[in-house]
Curated annotation (Swiss-Prot):
The transporter is composed of YjjB and YjjP. Belongs to the ThrE exporter (TC 2.A.79) family. This is Probable succinate transporter subunit YjjB. The keyword Transferase does not apply. It comes from Shigella flexneri. One of its GO terms (biological process) is succinate transport. It holds the Pfam family ThrE_2.
């Protein structure tokens, strides 16, 4: 993939990630003045995950690093705009949730219950379930670490 193709794919990824970030921000009753920042943070998070995955990291570690970046930026923006960090961060990480892995695991479990046990279905179920669980864990831990680190009262060392 050339540089131009990568930049176009990155721009497309970031624009498409901003749409569900704004949608979920509206569902969570985020103030109107913060909607554009939720969209920007959602696209920054998803774009950084794409860059990390393109550079060779797997999806779990890329999601962890991207959610840490989203948490850090959200804390800084909350200080600037006098809002809680969750106003910006929660809606911004939702586009990174593992919908395809969770859906594939669910479909595999339904097929196992209908057709009976088969090893390929069980491998598909476990692989996708563990991938989805790891991504959700990476999102939650990565989003909480910047708050634990930056709001710490005692010395870090």
């Amino acid at each position: 993939m050339g540089v131009i193709e990568f930049l176009l794919a990155l721009a497309q990824d970031m624009i498409l990630a901003a749409i569900p970030a704004v949608g979920f921000a509206m569902v969570f009753n985020v103030p109107v003045r913060a909607l554009r920042w939720c969209a920007l943070l959602g696209s920054i998070g998803h774009g950084s995950r794409m860059i990390l995955m393109t550079s060779g990291l797997n999806i779990e570690w890329s999601t962890f690093m991207a959610s840490m970046l989203v948490g850090t930026i959200g804390i800084q923006w909350s200080r600037w705009y006098l809002a809680h960090p969750k106003v910006f961060t929660v809606a911004a990480v939702i586009p990174m949730f593992p919908g395809i892995s969770a859906y594939t695991a669910m479909i595999s479990s339904v097929k196992i219950s209908q057709l009976g046990y088969s090893e390929p279905l069980m491998i598909t179920l476990l692989t996708n379930f563990l991938t989805a669980s790891s991504i959700v864990g990476a999102l939650s831990i990565g989003l909480s670490i910047p708050g634990l680190w930056l709001y710490r009262k005692r010395p870090r060392v």
